[in-house]
Amino acid sequence: MYRSHNNNNNYHSRNDGSNGRINKPRDPKSQDKYVAYQQNIEQQLASQEKKQAYRRITDHGNNMGRWYIEKSLGLTNRSQQAIGTIRPESSYLIDLLPSLAYSSSFNLNRRNNKNNLAVLDLQTKFVHLSSNKVKHTINTVKWTPEGRRLLVASHSGEFTLWNGMTFNFETIMQAHESPILTMKYSNHDEWLLSGDQNGTVKYWQPNFNNVNNISAHANGVRDIAFSPNDSKFLTCGDDSAIKIWNFNNGKEERTLSGHHWEVKSADWHPNLGLIVSGSKDNLVKLWDPRSANCVSTLHGFKHTVNKTRFQPNGTARLLASVSRDRSCRIFDLRTMKDMLVIRDSETDLSCVAWHPIHASMVTTAAYNGSISNFLLDSYIPDSNESVPKRSNNNSNLSTNTNNTIDAVQKIPYAHEKAIHAVEYHPLGHLLCTAGSDKTARFWSRARPNDPMAWKDAVYTDCKAGAWYYSVNNNVNAVMEDPNAVKNEDDEIANNDDPLSNSGRRRGVGASASGGATGSVPGLRSRNETPNNGSYAIPGLRGF
């Protein structure tokens, strides 16, 4: 009944009906070997078990719901919200309101940098990296109109959908036979247009049902834009032409001719009858879509204009363009001249995007994988002010001989290679970037009191192993610095937990016993005010 595999007193003997399980030896001398063998097996099984992993989730429903309740109660004036409520303590993360609550519409002191609440919406925190199993260069990304998913178009001609809250994969489909270069949702969110390297433009319904295909250009389609009422759309391509199409029948109506090289980007003004285009001939041109005539040509760039975009909100009278001469220029449509020049001393710029909520926030991306954020409030006059005249003594408008401004925040190692796409979430609380490193990366607003923020790999370029899975990736996304010097005055007794019983903010000026006072580490007292009215946000310059 037993079969012995060696002469060691039935050690390693097994029962034919025991499914291979080793029986405990009867000889006491073999007990030690048996126990050691069993422990070795258990250790091997334990090492094979998957470690518990935490997935980051961005739930905008909480702060959006709180804000709507406050609006219904008439508490919409949040001009002092950042100073009075958001404090440098990690538990205050849930008190961050939607981006709209910090916009100029609800901030009475927008022109005062000390109370500029737009800094709270700078996307400085790396959240997640998404990539397909079979990786390809990503040329463009778009958030779906409702903001629940991110649509990624790759060089393989595939559409990939990623969840916008949990960032997990949802579906993939073959959309084009050649690399997809551009996508655009209609203003009324009913249609999606995509263009590929063969010059084909495809119509898509929200459920990704392809209903029409047109051959738009002889070469690749570089950009697509809808008219304000969605009755027409434009395309530009490598054949140096800009074409206006009737959306309903897919017929070409006009061709805008004037560029002498590939047209890299084009946009249709959201309110005005105005089209802008940027080309490889270093020129930015403004067009009248009705007459197909060029109304103005903007000079100043010394290399290819990669991207040009109208200001989508606010006064909607500004134009941002980036070029391979390492500069981004902000043009005023009333004077047809550049008001500001943003320069990157390290590499050429590839993308530019306006924040969907904050009209004065601009984000640029570069070929070295860096991302820079700019706030233009202090440099641009209000809509009721006159157009500034150039003066060498007017430093507030940056119209001096240098005519440049610095980034208020920069992520130097956001990607490993060139960035091809920068897209804001419709609510403004998330930013997605993608590029030649074949990944799509998500960025969110900074966490209050995150001492390890500067030690993320996107700031230190520490890429040991799977670096993007270990970037400050604990449950609360906030870690204490192990090398930080502890302040005895900030230490709280074990029986005086500020997060217990009476709430998570009881430690300010009070203690559990009701007599002695204590303070939560990193939490300012209510009577203490910042020196300059600003709070520590990773990568943010002080005002």
From Swiss-Prot:
UniProt biased composition (Low complexity): 1-12
Organism: Candida albicans (strain SC5314 / ATCC MYA-2876) (Yeast)
Entry's Gene Ontology BP terms: chromosome segregation; co-transcriptional mRNA 3'-end processing, cleavage and polyadenylation pathway
Pfam families membership: WD40 (PF00400)
Alphabetical list of InterPro entries matching this protein: Pfs2-like, WD40/YVTN_repeat-like_dom_sf, WD40_repeat_dom_sf, WD40_rpt
Spans annotated as Disordered: 1-31, 486-543
Function: Required for 3'-end cleavage and polyadenylation of pre-mRNAs. Also involved in chromosome segregation where it has a role in chromosome attachment to the mitotic spindle.
Main location: nucleus
Encoding gene per record: PFS2
Coiled-coil spans in chain: none
Keywords per UniProt: Chromosome partition, mRNA processing, Nucleus, Repeat, WD repeat
Cited PROSITE patterns: WD_REPEATS_2 (PS50082), WD_REPEATS_REGION (PS50294)
Cellular location(s): Nucleus
WD repeats: 133-172, 175-215, 216-255, 258-297, 300-341, 344-384, 414-453
Name of the featured protein: Polyadenylation factor subunit 2
Transmembrane domains' residue ranges: none
Cellular component, GO annotation: chromatin; mRNA cleavage and polyadenylation specificity factor complex
